[in-house]
Amino acid sequence: MTQPRITPSQVEVAEARRTTLPNGIGLYTLASDDFEVLRISFVFRAGSSMQHAPFAASATANMLSEGSRDMTARQIAERLDFHGSYFEVNVDRDYVYISFSSLSKFFGPTLEVAEQILLQPLFPEDELRAYCEKRKQTLTIERRKVDTVVREIFAEALFGDKHPYGISYPEKDYDTLTRADLESLYRRLYTAENCLVVCSGRIGEEELQGIGALAEKLPRADRSATADFPAPRSEAYRFVERPDAVQSSLRVGRLLFTRTHPDFVGMQVVATVLGGYFGSRLMQNLRGEHGYTYGVGAAMVNFEREGYLGIAAQVGAEVTAPALREIYNEIERLRREPMPEEELSLVKNIMTGEVMRILDGPFGIADVTIENLLCGTNNGVIEENIRRIQSITPAEVQRLAVKYLRREDLITAVVGAVDPKHEI
């Protein structure tokens, strides 16, 4: 039976109100009175692609709350806990996301702590050494796992091992990370030119003035920070041997384009058909028919300057080659045969429903707003993307697969006990 269609008219997303502060920062507001909570998100272009020393970007972001001019790390944590406030840091290749969430009635005390964290960090030497030692140990343990290693070598195969999106650093580089490295990155990147602020939840004029006053204190730089981005240098196949591994970790994919490309949404549909939900083609094949894996996934991944399609699975070592062959077979089947309308209708509804789930609540809307702002668009693109999803045809899915998923363009990375290259 054909799935009932979920229409774009069911998704209405408010546009953020922009205020430009005297120091040039864009302050975006998404007011909602549904809940007595609010969140402030500061987004800095200060991700790992911008760092001059290995691990400096993540260390700087995570050390912001480890002591300030007027408060110790413990005092910061206790003050936030006392008011039920929440502080979160996320770091990716391009950006650092720093968020403060609180009940509306405790906004004032939370903002005071936010000012200490954002404007007065000390990066204490003893806290830094403890942080580096802990992260070094964690990374050493993680790199014993085939899934961690394949993620790193797949990035290297896509972009090249010197590219900001492909480079990995040895654990020992934590030993040479210094307080001066963090202070230098902080001064260079945590500036007004490098920042935008998004507020969501129950926000009145008083709260908005307080947020604006804090953001206005961020220093200005001579110019916006830039990074060296060489052209990616892809490698078709990478293998790392782990003789004792009982499972192999696999990645298959290719470089494509960023979210602003006209075919990005269509390729999101292609990725979902292949491995974006439990009943996807790769799940039915590798898990359902063959029992090679408990799970396999596919997705389009977007960075600021590049994007790619990736397929990921972990399979038994003895079925590494057969599993890869089935991945290639499913890609080829999508290229060769138009998919059934009923299957595509299900995929459309799953994708539209996921958008609606993400947008359920002020903070989810704020997250999507941030993503759109960083891509140079606004929230109007959400409805447009849903229209694209709902209007795509089996012929269009096949056209995209034919155009972008040629076998000779695919990049494969494997970590495991046996190299399957000559069997695939």
Task: Indicate residue ranges for each PLM-predicted region.
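Residues that act as N-cap/strand-start positions at coil-to-secondary-structure junctions
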Residues: 12-13, 81, 234
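Short acidic/glycine-enriched loop/turn segments that link adjacent beta-strands
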Residues: 13, 36, 94-95, 246, ...
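Charge-rich, well-structured scaffold segments of protease-associated domains
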Residues: 1-2, 20, 31, 75-223, ...
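N-terminal cap/recognition module
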Residues: 47-50, 64
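N- or domain-start disorder-to-order transition segments that initiate the globular core
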Residues: 1-37
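Active-site SXXK
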Residues: 55-66
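His/Glu-based metal-binding/catalytic segments typifying zinc-dependent metallopeptidases
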Residues: 25-46, 53-54, 222-280
